[in-house]
Curated annotation (Swiss-Prot):
Encoding gene (name): cysI
Pfam family, one: NIR_SIR
Protein's name according to its UniProt entry: Sulfite reductase [NADPH] hemoprotein beta-component
Species classification: Bacteria, Pseudomonadati, Pseudomonadota, Gammaproteobacteria, Vibrionales
E.C. code: 1.8.1.2
EC class: oxidoreductase
Cofactor(s) the record lists: siroheme; [4Fe-4S] cluster
Family to which the UniProt record says this protein belongs: Belongs to the nitrite and sulfite reductase 4Fe-4S domain family.
């Protein structure tokens, strides 16, 4: 049944799912995502957005937030929370020019509460702390440099990720071009964004959404283009993945993986993280048709009654993988060929210089938790801006929240490195453990956070570094460690060897059993424990790993082999078993 028919009760393939959720009413009545956002912008009595607009601004790339550190104090003073918005830019493949960077640096300095640029796991940047009077200026500033934030949140296809591989320059360029094409093809066609934020002309006549439908998708939808053997984008965190298959340095097609996703809800066993299923191989010329077919099948078959079960991963488990795949083949007019062979061998960023096959040099900078700000003794934000003033190539934001200074000619390497070192952007002493640890934003800005993540991780990693040293593990040894402040999973903890999921202030669920390459879901080992208890558990487990492991055996693989945790093979069956 098509999403455009708007029945009062949803039925899919003969199964009644229930009455449509209120979010479906909201989208249907929004006049293609316009709502009354323009009227809200004029209301200076409150710093926030009201009623449906609170949800609708997400489709325009923004979340309403407030500073939770001062929420209680403002309440005592009879003030509303310090409402502001976070904006996530649409940057397919994460490539940004020096000119664009200097513009976003200036806006962050002059018009945000926190003055920072936050690189994210969605391979883009976020502004945090933009007050209502500056929101339209923000969109117009971005538009003037060729950037927008259309569909980086909400029930749509979000920012399309692409492996940040500067070495395989020709293959990366081709894959990146497909990431851009997919992003444009699946973008909402409504004129609402231009009308509201860019003072665009209001054109009479109906909007149409041929792929997304008038009710858009049942839930968020995430897409990647990945170049093996590097799984930096974490394919199993995403609804739709195009695995690049190359021959002689040329892209010839994609293996298509569908139905990954990490979000869950505490206490609801109908929700779980899930690996993506391999549908098979397609030639390049069928890429956009297949992307649209997967999206439209999820549009029509996804659960619009229960948002907790609305993502593609649950649709596949409900209707069956083969049934979903057959529908995609029917809609795209193709038959999937057997998948071509590939292997993932890594997913962390290689920090430092590498030389591409095109002779250009690329410097990957480790940005702890993606926060680009001038810290005491480490003026990172100033440093990146100074590099941008002289850099002749581009920047590439990675899905690991780092930044690549890409396309540096040999005669400029020394200048770029000197600028990076003098501003604290290169630290030769940073450990492999710190490089391979990651956290989402969480407090104080994320309204969903249940526990600290970004502010918690640096000192926690220091403790873990001490544990590794205590057990005489080599300096290059590390554990993929991730912290996410709530079970929505932005920090991708559900693909880590050690994953911490926030449960309450100072308390986390401890998950073990993921692997280094991001192809296995970890399982809960201990529930609702403190950071002190977590470190005690890690100390004991690392001690066993150091003394009992096989040659080259990763921590996650060891926990499975040693029987410390059971392997999750089929999430619906195994994750809570």
């Amino acid at each position: 049944m098509s999403a455009n028919q708007n029945p009062s009760v949803q039925e899919v393939l003969g199964e009644v799912l229930g009455p449509w959720s209120d979010n479906e009413r909201l989208k249907r009545e929004s006049h293609f995502l316009r709502g009354t956002i323009e009227q809200d912008l004029q209301d200076r009595i409150t710093g926030g957005f009201t009623a449906d607009n609170f949800q609708l601004i997400r489709f325009h790339g923004m979340y309403q937030q407030d500073d939770r550190d001062i929420r209680a104090e403002r309440s005592k003073q009879k003030l509303e929370p310090l409402h502001n918005v976070m904006l996530r830019a649409r940057m397919p493949g994460g490539i940004i020019t020096p000119h664009q960077w200097l513009a976003i640096d200036k806006f962050a300095t002059e018009h945000t509460l926190y003055g920072s640029i936050r690189l994210t796991t969605r391979q883009t940047f976020q502004f945090h702390g933009v007050l209502k009077p500056n929101i339209k200026l923000m969109h117009q500033t971005l538009n003037s440099i060729g950037i927008d934030s259309i569909a980086t949140a909400g029930d749509v296809n979000r920012n399309v990720l692409c492996t940040s591989n500067p070495v395989e320059s020709q293959l990366h360029l081709q894959a990146y071009e497909w990431a851009k094409k997919i992003s444009e093809h699946l973008l909402p066609k409504t004129r609402a964004y231009a009308e509201i934020w860019l003072d665009g002309e209001k054109i009479e006549g109906p909007d149409e959404e041929p792929i997304l439908g008038s009710n858009y998708l049942p839930r968020k939808f995430k897409t990647t283009v990945v170049i093996p053997p590097h799984n930096d984008v974490d394919v199993h965190a995403n609804d739709l993945n195009f695995v690049a298959i190359g021959e002689n340095g040329q892209l010839i097609g994609f293996n298509v993986l569908v139905g990954g996703g990490l979000a869950m809800t505490h206490g609801d066993t109908s929700t779980y993280p899930r690996r993506a299923d391999d549908f098979g191989f397609i030639p390049l010329e069928k890429t956009l048709e297949v992307a649209a077919a997967v999206v439209s099948t999820q549009r029509d078959w996804g659960n619009r009654s229960n948002r907790k079960n609305a993502k593609t991963k649950y649709t596949l488990d409900r209707v069956g993988v083969e049934v979903f795949k057959a529908e995609v083949e029917k809609r795209a007019g193709i038959t999937f060929a057997p998948s071509r062979a590939y292997e993932f061998t890594s997913r962390g960023d290689r920090i430092g210089w590498v030389e591409g096959i095109d002779g250009k040099h690329h410097l990957t900078l480790f940005i702890e938790n993606g926060r680009i700000l001038d810290f005491p003794g480490k003026p990172l934000k100033t440093g990146v801006a100074e590099i941008a003033k002289v850099h002749q190539g581009d920047f590439r934001m990675t899905a690991n929240q780092n930044l690549i200074v890409a396309g540096v000619p040999a005669d400029q390497k020394q200048q770029i490195e000197q600028l990076a070192r003098s501003h604290g952007l290169i630290d030769d002493g940073v450990s492999e453990q710190r490089i391979n640890s990651m956290a989402c934003v969480a407090f104080p800005t994320c309204p969903l956070a249940m526990a600290e993540a970004e502010r918690f991780l640096p000192s926690f990693v220091t403790e873990v570094e001490g544990i590794l040293a205590k057990h005489a593990l080599p300096k290059e040894e590390n554990i993929i460690l991730r912290v996410t402040g709530c079970p929505n999973g932005c920090g991708r903890a559900m693909l880590a060897e050690i994953g911490l999921v926030g449960k309450a202030p100072g308390r986390y669920n401890l998950h073990l059993g993921g692997n280094r390459n991001g192809t296995r879901i970890p399982k809960m080992y201990k529930e609702n424990i403190t950071d002190t208890q977590i470190l005690q558990e890690i100390d004991e487990l690392v001690g066993r790993w150091a003394s009992e492991r096989l040659d080259g055996e990763g921590f996650g693989d060891f926990t499975i082999r040693a029987g410390i945790i059971e392997e999750v093979i089929i999430s619906k069956r195994d994750f809570y078993a």
